[in-house]
Amino acid sequence: MLEKISDTLTFECETGNYHTFCPISCVAWLYQKIEDSFFLVVGTKTCGYFLQNALGVMIFAEPRYAMAELEEGDISAQLNDYEELKRLCIQIKKDRNPSVIVWIGTCTTEIIKMDLEGMAPKLEAEIGIPIVVARANGLDYAFTQGEDTVLAAIVHRCPDYKLQNKTDLTDNDIQEDATRFSFLKLRKNNIRSISATNSHPPLVLFGSLPTTVSSQLNLELKRNQIEVSGWLPTQRYTDLPSLGEGVYVCGVNPFLSRTATTLMRRKKCKLISAPFPIGPDGTRAWIEKICNVFNIQPTGLEERENKIWDGLEDYLDLVRGKSVFFMGDNLLEISLARFLIRCGMIVYEIGIPYMDKRYQAAELMLLQKTCEMMNVPLPRIVEKPDNYNQIQRIRELKPDLAITGMAHANPLEARGISTKWSVEFTFAQIHGFTNARDILELVTRPLRRNQSLHELGWNNLVKVNSQ
C-alpha cells in the first residue's frame, strides 16, 4: 500500500508485527520526572516480570512504582476490584503520601473490562489523593506511546487558563482554581493563573525530558525573548501549568500525538507544529518556528548551529558516507534519520511502527529539505514494516549500521550486520544543541568497534567451525 503526500515524499505501508517493548515501560522515566507521584501498574505476573527485568531497580531503592497483580479471583470476578484497589491505595498513602497516584492499565484490564475510570473518582474522594488513569497497554504501536497516554490523562487535570493583566487574585479566583486540587494543600502561588505580562502569549512545552535538558531548552528560548510558562509533565504534580484558549503548546517528542490532540480538542490550546529539537538542525528549526509564531526575530541561531557542527567534526569524519537502516521501534526514527542525513550518512530505509502525518508534518518537511540540501535521494519510509521483508532488504543493501529493536539485534549481528539498539536513543539525552554529540556517540560506537576489530584482524564476531 502506497500513500503519496507530496510530489516527492512517499510512504509505504506493510502489515508487519510490532516487535517492541510494552508501553508500561513509560513508568521507568515518568516516576523519576514527576517526583511527588506514585505509579501503580494493574496487570498480571507477566507485567511484573517485565517491569522488574526492564527497569532493573534494586529492591533497596524503594522505587515510587508498584505492581497490583491480578489473580484468578480478580479475573473471575470473585473479588471486589474496588475494595482491593482501595486497600492498596490506602497502603500507598500511608507509606509514601504522594501528591498523585497514577493507575496504569494493561492488556488484561482491557480484556476483562475493568472499569478503572469509574472507580478512580470515587476512590479519589474517599482517600483524598488525586488518581489519574492511563491505559498504557500493549495495544499501542510503540512503547514510547505509554508516555503519550499518561500525559494525555494528566492534561485533563491541568487548571484552566485565565488571562490576567495583574498578578493579584481575588478570593473567588483562588476558590475556583482550588476546587481542581481540593485534595492538596496548595499555596496561593501554586494556583495562580498565568499572567499576561510577557510580550507574547503563554507557551507550554510538553514531553518528558531530564531536568537539565528542559532547562537548556528554556535557556535557548529565553535568549530569543521567549519565556516558557510551564512544562507537561512538571517535576511536581501540584505545579501543573494552566491550559486553555490563548495558550500555545509545542511538543518536544514525535510520539506525543495523542497529547497534542487532547490539548487542542479538550483544552482549546493552539499547537505550534514544529520540527523536534533533536540535533542542531532540528533545534534551530524548532526555535525558529516558535519565534515565527510569536512574530519575534530570532538572533544568533545560525552562528550557534554552525558552532555546534564545528565541534562535531571528529564524529562527522567517522559517519560521513556510511549507510544506516532504521527497522522501526520507538517513533524517533524520522527525527534521527533527518539528523544523520545532515551528518552525511546515507539512510536506506526508515521503518516506523506508526506515523501521525499531521503531528509530524513539520519534521517530514525538514527531512525533505535536508535531503535536498545534502543532494541525496529521499529514503523509503515504511509504516508497520514486515520484519521478514526488512531482513531481505538488509541482505541486499548491506548497510553499515542497522538501528533496531533489541529482538533483532543479535540475529543481525550473527549475520554480519552492525546494530545499535533503538531503545538507547529513548533513554539518552538527545534534545537540544549541546546533546547532538551524545547521538553521534551512540551511532558511532559500533562503527568504532568494527574499526578496532578490523585493525586487530578480527573480521568476524561469530566463530565459524572449520570443516
UniProtKB/Swiss-Prot annotation:
One annotated Gene Ontology cellular component of this protein: chloroplast
Binding locations of [4Fe-4S] cluster: 22, 47, 107
Cofactor: [4Fe-4S] cluster
Subcellular location(s) of the protein: Plastid, Chloroplast
Function: Component of the dark-operative protochlorophyllide reductase (DPOR) that uses Mg-ATP and reduced ferredoxin to reduce ring D of protochlorophyllide (Pchlide) to form chlorophyllide a (Chlide). This reaction is light-independent. The NB-protein (ChlN-ChlB) is the catalytic component of the complex.
Matches recorded under InterPro entries: LIPOR_BchN/ChlN, Nase/OxRdtase_comp1, Protochl_reductN
Taxonomic source organism: Chara vulgaris (Common stonewort)
Domain of life: Eukaryota
Protein name in the entry: Light-independent protochlorophyllide reductase subunit N
Catalytic activity from the UniProt record: chlorophyllide a + oxidized 2[4Fe-4S]-[ferredoxin] + 2 ADP + 2 phosphate = protochlorophyllide a + reduced 2[4Fe-4S]-[ferredoxin] + 2 ATP + 2 H2O
Keywords for the protein's UniProt record, in alphabetical order: 4Fe-4S, ATP-binding, Chlorophyll biosynthesis, Chloroplast, Iron, Iron-sulfur, Metal-binding, Nucleotide-binding, Oxidoreductase, Photosynthesis, Plastid
HAMAP family in alphabetical order: ChlN_BchN
Keyword Iron-sulfur: yes
Coiled-coil ranges (or none): none
Pathway participation: Porphyrin-containing compound metabolism; chlorophyll biosynthesis (light-independent)
Family: Belongs to the BchN/ChlN family.
Highest classification ranks of the organism: Eukaryota, Viridiplantae, Streptophyta, Charophyceae, Charales
Keyword Metal-binding assigned: yes
